[in-house]
Amino acid sequence: DSTEYDAILLVAFGGPESPQDVMPFLENVTRGRRVPRERLLEVAAHYDRFGGVSPLNGQVRALRDALADLLLSRGIDLPVHWGNRNWDPLLPDTMAEMASAGIRRVLAVVLSGYSSYSSCRQYLENIEAARQSVGESAPVVDKVRAFFNHPEFVAASAECLSEALVGFESAEVAFTAHSIPASMAAG
């Protein structure tokens, strides 16, 4: 029931939006983990190949706008907010903005759809830390379940894959969230 909520909150990882953002972003992501500077520079080189920009923030903006439009087309007038774990707009800032706007109850959609510590529980911890940073005026946040195995998500993913494979006689498909260093993959 949409009347239970004052807003929807999209929660994402975040990503750099310019070459100048890359190293500060990576330092934020790896904060407290003692990742060698050389490794950060290696990862930064991956971003350099794409102009120092992660596509994630643009994709989340497009999703936010499409979701707001879809809700309005169905007669649901809920603002759609967005907060990231690791880069602007940061989750604590978004939580503070929602509190300032008088928003009391939020439905959060974590855009990492699979279930693991970093894609599920850590986001819950991030949401709670953001609430704590705001204090008593912070909205109550309910989270939508991980959606990796939701039948409609699976069907949409299968449809996109089928469309992408048109014209290939045969293909091998590997599913991955992102790359990992070869040294980690080797064990």
Regions found by a protein language model. Name each.
Residues 1-187:
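Active-site-proximal alpha-helix that buttresses catalytic centers in soluble enzyme cores
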